[in-house]
Structure formats: structure tokens, C-alpha cells
């Protein structure tokens, strides 16, 4: 279930941020509330209808694709798979750029965490109000910019189709390696799925 939806549209230098609080209709776990600061009570009192928020989020994503924009989403298989599960019919019809995947593919053996906070530190991006939805969306976009412009300029030479294929192949390879590792440790690997930008 969605608690906050934040979409930051960056188009030719113009920035438009839209964040919406949703009432998920279920209890928000205390641990999650401590991270993002939104309690069940706050969501119920101030949040909009959950299904409306999801529908408007999907419509905004599709509008961005229609306008020729690229969707930057940190850990795309998680968020986009959630949208598909919530709507039943969400599909990817435009370009996606996943800063987490790019980082894992380009710097595979770097030790340490790869959450958004640590990635901002690694790429020299300022992150204000971590775990606040709009701040996280801005930060993901800035990390993507740094990756393409400063660290991996070869990505800028790819067209949309090539970039999508590159990410899908890299994700498949990374997941296959992860699956083999789990199996070598006698661990269940059934949830290690290869699909990108959506699982399955």
C-alpha cells in the first residue's frame, strides 16, 4: 500500500514537485512510521483516498512518458511492481533510469550499503530530509544526473532502447549471481527474480 506519492518533474530546468499523502486503509507499522514520520492517525486524518492517489500517480507517470521524459526511480523493480500489483494493469511504456541498478552494475564490488543516503554521499549529492518522499525523489534524480554526467558518461551515448536493454541485462546478470550465491549457501532463492524494470 502507498502512504506518500512524490513525483518531481524536471523538464528543461523547470522543476515541479507534487507530493500526496494517502490513507492506505491499513495500520502503518510503528517501525515504518519512525522512518518516514507518518503515523496511522495522520494518514487517516489527512490522507486522500488510496486508490485515487495511486491512479493519479500512474496517470502522471504516463503523462511524463508521453511528453518524452524519463522516469527516474531508485530500485525500480520494487516501486513499479507495487504499482502493477495495486492497479492490476500498470505497464512500462516509456524509458526508466534506475540509479541503484546503475551503481550496482558499474561499481559491482564496492563494499558498504547502497541505500539512497549512502549513494548520495558516494556521488556527492546533498540529501535534505531523508525518507521524506519529495526529498528522496529529488535526490534520486540528482544521483542519476551525477552518474550520467560525471561518472559514467558512456551512458549518455546510449539511445533509449539501448539504455533500457543495458539495465535489463545487467539486472538479470546481477540477480543470477545473487541466486547462485544463495543456493551455494543453502538458502532459498525462489524470491530472487530477474525481471526489470518490473519483477516477474
Q: Which role fits each region the language model picked out?
A:
Residues 15-36, 40:
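Short, surface-exposed acidic-centric catalytic microdomains
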Residues 1, 10-16, 38-200:
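DEDD superfamily 3′-5′ metal-dependent exonuclease/proofreading module
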Residues 6-8:
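Conserved hydrophobic/aromatic positions in well-ordered beta-strands
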Residues 1-3, 26-27:
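Short, flexible loop/turn motifs enriched in small residues
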